[in-house]
Amino acid sequence: MLELVDITYQPETGNKKVLDKVSLKINKNEIILIIGKSGSGKTTLLEIISGLIEHQKGNIVWQNKLVNSRQRRWLCGMVFQFPERYFLGSTIGKELKFGYKSIKESKIKNVLNKVGLSNINLTSPPEQLSGGQQRRLAVAIQLLRSPNFLLLDEPTAGLDWSMKNDVKDLINNISSENTIIVVTHEPELFEEVTSKKFVLIEGKLIQWRKDLER
């Protein structure tokens, strides 16, 4: 279990706390949904969990031990909003192998099969994939790292409805083997596979209730 205890974050240039004593328990194979208005701190929370930025107060505990930002970067795989903007390889194959001295072809094949890309041409550029396929590729890149937690920031942003459903099906397909945290403005897409849903309001993380929609 990963546990966040009273996490507080305030940007150096701001005078308001983006996150104020946020606590959250994430159990193995759960899918956690986090919603909230734009600018409410959802992406910031993912970046703290994944070790990309450091919080000022509070603790993050993994298997009853405090974990620092460097350790969390190993624990977590994060797929940013519009991940296709960050592709660096000239081909899909090079994109998948980027950063590895060596990686088994069997592992790549297995991960591509999990995300529904088993039939793609690895010599093609990533730009030739559809929007939904590019999101699947971004997830595959993170799954190759075998992370304990997969963090998805607005995974359906900018996609048409059919591609949104493509991403929903992907999350559904990998949910049995992965612990996933999804930040989204479209919670209705993922509610059938969600374990818990939270909303960020004025820096506070609150377990979702029906009356919070008002």
Regions found by a protein language model. Give the residues of each.
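Catalytic Walker B motif of ABC-type/P-loop ATPase nucleotide-binding domains
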Residues: 150-154
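ABC ATPase C-loop
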Residues: 142-143
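Conserved ABC ATPase signature
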Residues: 125-129, 133
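Conserved H-loop
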Residues: 178-184
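Conserved ABC transporter NBD signature motif
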Residues: 58-74, 117
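Conserved ABC ATPase "signature" region
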Residues: 105-120
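ABC-family nucleotide-binding domains
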Residues: 160
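Helix-to-loop junction immediately C-terminal to a conserved catalytic motif
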Residues: 50
